[in-house]
Amino acid sequence: MVSIRPDEISSILKKQIADYDKSVSVSNVGTVLQIGDGIARVYGLEKAMAGELVEFEDGTEGIALNLEDDNVGAVLMGEGLGIQEGSTVKATGKIASVPVGDAMLGRVVNPLGQPVDGNGEIATSDSRLIESLAPGIIKRKSVHEPMQTGITSIDAMIPIGRGQRELIIGDRQTGKTAIAIDTIINQKGQDVVCVYVAVGQKSASVAQVVEVLREKGALEYTIVVNASASEAAALQYLAPYTGAAIAEHFMYQGKATLVIYDDLTKQAQAYRQMSLLLRRPPGREAYPGDVFYCHSRLLERAAKLSDAMGSGSMTALPIIETQAGDVSAYIPTNVISITDGQIFLSADLFNSGLRPAINVGISVSRVGGAAQTKAIKKIAGTLKLELAQFDELAAFSQFASDLDEATQQQLERGKRLRELLKQAQFAPLNLAEQVAVVYAGVKGLIDEVPVEQVTQFAAELREYLKTSKPDYINQVLTEKKLSDDIEAVLKESINEVKSSMLAAA
């Protein structure tokens, strides 16, 4: 028979009492009632907050969006293949946040800030809430510094300033992304941090963009946030806010930032999908009632901060895709009313060979004029008007058989201006080159050059200035204005290039 030794029992009891942890952990737990289509209905979670992160049994995260009487509607930020009815859900008490910092530069991340480029973990300890309040009026300053895109027609006629929101709108395949990528490439050496947010795009297209940025040496100051078409609707909806949060980190450090949302139409569609599955009442075009707020709270985060706040800036270039050029649809009109101007790309102009296919007539920059450099402002004042008049006259001249000399001259000048503004993709021009090209056209110095040779003339002029007149380029780039001396040098250069071209012909 085993003898029971009291001292052994007492020592075991003492050890257990010593090891006893009396701390109590309280967690808000619920049960999955229904799961499917990226939406989970959860019973319980009484204390869940709107927008709170919830964690499912299989590790998938979700966001509590619908707080109803008897259940919580959550959207999944992942596949959620391991989630079953009856499995437990835990409220985390946190709102979605994303890692930020210099370590993010040159990386491709998903909307949760996790790297997807195969280059290892991102070593940063800083994080920032994905949703945060936009700066108030007192914290802002009016837009007054230029954000050069490197695209002559934009910098001359639709100038963009640091801290502005400028919409790029047009049908599919009209060169919207090309303008955005050119703008990123043009920021090289300007100490601007760029964030490119790809929403609902093909992974192959995003890989191509990343490769172009790498080739042009632009990836080192760019962060790419990718929520491809194959990802959950919740991630596509979150991606733009993630991009804004990453840029805000640099903005509040006093840096200039540029964010491209490509495109917000896909984000609105993802939000519509989530809202309809959550059984929220649909409105116009089946979008939920708060889709305007979805975009306005995102774009209001772009700002030029006051000196007291460090003078940082976030410039936003949202992209919207239209159907058959219809800018009066719901999402286009919403975003047009939120932004500080729009660049409208026309499929007809694109197909006629004008690249970038900017329709100058309905494109506008509401605040960029104050930020435009003096050099280009001085000469480009009449450019937009002349091109608009040319479009009108070109349409009229198709029906009129005999035109007076002044009209004929205006048409000829318009054709040459059109040719001058044509630009190759991924080849942004600096300010001095833009000034030279626009000056030659507006002042009528190339009226004798045949239309088909204008593009060649522009290329030769730029090359001549680089090799023979480097002082002109340096002076315009440093002073950013066109003095009488520089203007004389420019005029002489244009005439020399023109003479040699006409002589060769």
Swiss-Prot record:
Its EC number is 7.1.2.2. It is found in: Cellular thylakoid membrane. GO terms for molecular function: ADP binding; ATP binding; proton-transporting ATP synthase activity, rotational mechanism. InterPro entries: ATP_synth_asu-like_sf, ATP_synth_asu_C, ATP_synth_asu_C_sf, ATP_synth_F1_a_nt-bd_dom, ATP_synth_F1_asu, ATPase_a/bsu_AS, ATPase_F1/V1/A1_a/bsu_N, ATPase_F1/V1/A1_a/bsu_N_sf. The keyword Acetylation does not apply. It comes from the Bacteria. It catalyses: ATP + H2O + 4 H(+)(in) = ADP + phosphate + 5 H(+)(out). The keyword Thylakoid applies. CDD domains: ATP-synt_F1_alpha_C, ATP-synt_F1_alpha_N, F1-ATPase_alpha_CD. One of its GO terms (cellular component) is plasma membrane-derived thylakoid membrane. It is a peripheral membrane protein. Belongs to the ATPase alpha/beta chains family. Produces ATP from ADP in the presence of a proton gradient across the membrane. The alpha chain is a regulatory subunit. PANTHER family: ATP SYNTHASE SUBUNIT ALPHA, MITOCHONDRIAL. This is ATP synthase subunit alpha. It comes from Prochlorococcus marinus (strain SARG / CCMP1375 / SS120). The lineage of its organism: Bacteria, Bacillati, Cyanobacteriota, Cyanophyceae, Synechococcales. The gene is atpA.
